[in-house]
C-alpha cells in the first residue's frame, strides 16, 4: 500500500507484488526485528552484569565529575611490558569488547546488509583462516550443540569468519543465566588473548569468578521480603528486558496476524470479482435461454393459429357445398 501510494503521488505506474513476494518480505522484516531485539537484550544483560561485578563507588563518581572532558582515559590494562593483566581488567575488557561488537553488528545490520564482509573496529589484524582455533574443529558447523560447554577464548585478532561463529556460541550461553544457573554464565565471558600455557590459570580464575557470581545471585534472591517468587526477582534485577521482549513478541504476533488477515482479505477481494463475473455470465445465459424459449413458444402459437385458421376455412368451404 505504501509503494502504491508513493507511485500515485509521483504519477508512476503502480508496482505489482504477488502474495508470495509480500509474505517473503514480511518474513525478512520479522527476522530483522528479532535479531535487533536479541542484540538489545544481550547488551542490556551485559551492562547489568558489569555493574554487578564492578559497582561504581561514590568517590569514583565524584572524581569523574571534577575531571575535564579532554583528560585522556586511563588504560584498563597495565602498560608495563611483560606484566599480566589482572582478572578484573580482563573481564571488564571482555564485556566491553562484546558490547562493542554488538554495537558494530547492530549498526551494520541497519546500514549494510553485507555485514559478514565488513571488518569490525576491534579487529586490528587478521589471522590465517586455516589456523586451529581453541575449542573449535571442523565439525563445529554440523554439530554446534556439542560445543555448548566448551571454553571459548575470544580473540579480537580472530578471522572474521571465526569471530562470527564465536559470537553465535556466546549468545547461546545466555540461556543458562535466564534459567537461573549462574555458575554456567561465566562461560560467556571471554578472557582476552591467552596462550595454552595460561589455560590452568584461566581455569582457576573461572572458579573464583563463579563464586563471585554465585554470591551476587544469592544476594539477588534475598533482595525482597519473599513476597515475590525467584523467577520474578531474577527478572527484575537482571532480565528486565524479558517483559519488553514478551510484549514485543506479542505485538509482532498481532502484526503478523493483522498482515495475514490483510492478505486473506486481499485474496478474498479478488475472489468476489470472479464470482460476480460468473453470475453475470449465468444471468446472460439464462436470459438467452428465456428468449429462445419465448421465440419457440411464439412460433408454436403461430403454427397453431395458422392450423386453426386453415381448419376453419376448410369447414366453411364444406358448409357452402
Curated annotation (Swiss-Prot):
Topology versus the membrane: Peripheral membrane protein
Compositional bias annotation for Low complexity: 113-122
Q: Where in the cell is it found?
A: Cell membrane; Parasitophorous vacuole lumen; Secreted
For this UniProt record, the keywords arranged alphabetically read as follows: Cell membrane, Malaria, Membrane, Secreted
Q: How is it modified after translation?
A: Not glycosylated.
According to the record's subunit comment, the protein's assembly and interactions are:
Forms a complex composed of MSP1, MSP6, MSP7, MSP9 and MSP3; within the complex, MSP6 and MSP9 mediate the binding to the host erythrocyte. Interacts with MSP1 subunits p19 and p42; the interaction is direct. Interacts with host SLC4A1/Band 3 protein (via the 5ABC region). MSP1 subunits p19 or p42, and MSP9 form a co-ligand complex that interacts with host SLC4A1/Band 3 protein.
Chain's role: During the asexual blood stage, involved in the sialic acid-independent (SAID) merozoite invasion of host erythrocytes by binding to host SLC4A1/Band 3 protein on the surface of the host erythrocyte.
Q: Which family does it belong to?
A: Belongs to the plasmodium ABRA family.
What is the recorded name of this protein?
A: Merozoite surface protein 9
Organism this protein belongs to? Plasmodium falciparum (isolate FC27 / Papua New Guinea)
Amino acid at each position: 500500500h505504501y509503494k502504491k501510494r508513493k507511485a500515485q503521488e509521483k504519477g508512476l505506474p503502480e508496482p505489482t507484488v504477488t502474495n508470495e513476494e509480500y509474505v517473503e518480505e514480511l518474513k525478512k522484516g520479522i527476522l530483522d526485528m528479532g535479531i535487533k531485539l536479541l542484540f538489545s537484550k544481550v547488551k542490556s544483560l551485559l551492562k547489568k552484569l558489569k555493574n554487578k561485578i564492578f559497582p561504581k563507588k561514590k568517590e569514583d563518581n565524584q572524581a569523574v565529575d571534577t575531571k575535564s572532558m579532554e583528560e585522556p582515559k586511563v588504560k584498563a590494562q597495565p602498560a608495563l611490558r611483560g606484566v599480566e593483566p589482572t582478572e578484573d581488567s580482563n573481564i571488564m575488557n571482555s564485556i566491553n569488547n562484546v558490547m562493542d561488537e554488538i554495537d558494530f553488528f547492530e549498526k551494520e545490520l541497519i546500514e549494510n546488509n553485507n555485514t559478514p564482509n565488513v571488518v569490525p573496529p576491534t579487529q586490528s589484524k587478521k589471522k590465517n583462516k586455516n589456523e586451529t582455533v581453541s575449542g573449535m574443529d571442523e565439525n563445529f558447523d554440523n554439530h554446534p550443540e556439542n560445543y555448548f560447554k566448551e571454553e571459548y577464548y575470544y580473540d579480537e585478532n580472530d578471522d572474521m569468519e571465526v569471530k562470527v561463529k564465536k559470537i553465535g556460541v556466546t549468545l547461546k550461553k545466555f540461556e543458562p543465566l535466564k534459567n537461573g544457573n549462574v555458575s554456567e554464565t561465566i562461560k560467556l565471558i571471554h578472557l582476552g588473548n591467552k596462550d595454552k600455557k595460561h589455560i590452568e590459570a584461566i581455569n582457576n580464575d573461572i572458579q573464583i569468578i563463579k563464586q563471585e557470581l554465585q554470591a551476587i545471585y544469592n544476594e539477588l534472591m534475598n533482595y525482597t521480603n519473599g513476597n515475590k517468587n525467584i523467577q520474578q526477582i531474577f527478572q527484575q534485577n537482571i532480565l528486565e528486558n524479558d517483559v519488553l521482549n514478551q510484549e514485543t513478541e506479542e505485538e509482532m504476533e498481532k502484526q503478523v496476524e493483522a498482515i495475514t488477515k490483510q492478505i486473506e482479505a486481499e485474496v478474498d477481494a479478488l475472489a468476489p470479482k470472479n464470482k460476480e463475473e460468473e453470475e453475470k455470465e449465468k444471468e446472460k445465459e439464462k436470459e438467452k435461454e428465456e428468449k429462445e424459449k419465448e421465440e419457440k413458444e411464439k412460433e408454436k402459437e403461430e403454427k397453431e393459429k395458422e392450423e386453426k385458421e386453415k381448419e376453419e376455412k376448410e369447414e366453411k368451404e364444406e358448409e357452402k357445398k
